[in-house]
A protein has these predicted regions:
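Terminal amphipathic alpha-helical/low-complexity segments used for targeting or macromolecular assembly
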Residues: 1-49, 254-310
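Extended, small-residue-rich solenoid/repeat segments and analogous flexible loops
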Residues: 1-72, 77-120, 125, 131-135, ...
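Leucine-rich solenoid repeat scaffolds
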Residues: 236-258, 284
Length: 310
């Protein structure tokens, strides 16, 4: 059996760890090459072309197998698995029960932990943190300072970068792009060629799809849908069952005379969202008059204006 081994363990200068030394040529490894560190032989399969290069460490019950490679100063530990033709390198950290498979790449200072699955041709880099039971697959790309957790799913050709955060059961797929400080959670879905950026927040069962773009400080939630080529920016607050398909499907006003709060009107349901209020224009004016006459007069001017142009 020893004659069939492709490497042996040799002492190292790190307590509790050995280095791997190639016993034959395979892949880009030559007989006699000294690789990275392992805790025991179970950390690196004797089969396939898998290898640990440089000062990379694989320890605990972690396993590198098939044709996967780990190099640089990367660390793989816990019960993690790096298999198929996956690559983990630079200062990347893979912990717990993570699975990195297919042609997936994890690099730079990325951290992937818990029960995360990274597979297919997915790539994770920068200082991205992926945790809990999140899945990144397909040709998805996650980078920069992104945080993805809970049961979030990123797949297909989706791209998530900047300081974006995605959690809950949110899904981002097709060729959707998320960047800036965008936050997406709940059961929200971002699909098609949609773009979410700036400080936008999308949650509940909201859907952003097709070629729609949402940015700035826009909030989209409940069962609202932004679709087609709609461009929703500013401080819009889209909720309820609103559907926005174009720039003409919503209007945002600012209360410049007192509180500075924003009013959002959506055409599809003819509803207004102002602070905690959500309802018809008539209901909004009635509520404003109940607070004080001056407020009622100003609110009525806004409602009347919108009704005059729709």
């Amino acid at each position: 059996m020893d004659k069939e081994k492709k490497y042996e363990l040799i002492p190292s200068d790190r307590e509790g760890l050995y280095r791997v030394k190639a016993l034959k040529d395979f892949g880009k490894v030559k007989k006699g090459d000294i690789g990275g560190y392992v805790e025991c032989e179970n950390n690196l399969s004797q089969y396939g072309k898998c290898w640990i290069f440089d000062n990379a460490i694989v320890r605990d019950n972690a396993v590198v197998s098939d044709n996967a490679i780990v190099w640089g100063k990367a660390v793989v530990r816990g019960n993690a698995r790096v298999a198929d033709k996956a690559q983990v390198f630079d200062n990347a950290r893979i912990y717990h029960k993570v699975q990195v498979r297919g042609f997936a790449i994890v690099r730079d200072n990325a951290i992937v932990r818990d029960d995360v699955i990274v597979r297919d041709d997915a790539q994770i880099w920068g200082r991205a943190v992926i945790q809990d039971k999140a899945i990144v697959r397909g040709f998805a790309k996650v980078c920069d300072n992104v945080q993805i957790y809970d049961n979030a799913l990123i797949q297909d050709n989706a791209q998530v970068c900047g300081f974006a955060r995605i959690w809950g059961n949110a899904q981002v797929y097709c060729k959707a792009e998320i960047w800036g400080n965008a936050q997406i959670w709940g059961k929200a879905v971002i699909q098609g060629y949609a773009k979410v950026c700036g400080n936008a927040q999308i949650w509940d069962n909201a859907v952003i799809q097709d070629y729609a773009s949402v940015g700035d400080r826009t909030s989209v939630y409940d069962k609202a849908v932004i679709q087609d080529y709609a461009f929703v920016m500013g401080n819009a607050e889209v909720c309820g069952n609103a559907i926005i398909s174009s720039d003409k499907d919503y209007i945002v006003f600012k209360n410049w005379w007192s509180s500075g709060r924003y009013f959002t009107w959506t055409r599809s349901n003819n509803k207004w969202k102002v602070g905690c209020f959500f309802g018809t224009g008539e209901e909004l004016v009635t509520k404003a008059y109940a607070d004080n006459v001056e407020k009622g007069i100003e609110y009525k001017k806004i409602v009347d204006y919108v009704e005059s142009i729709i």
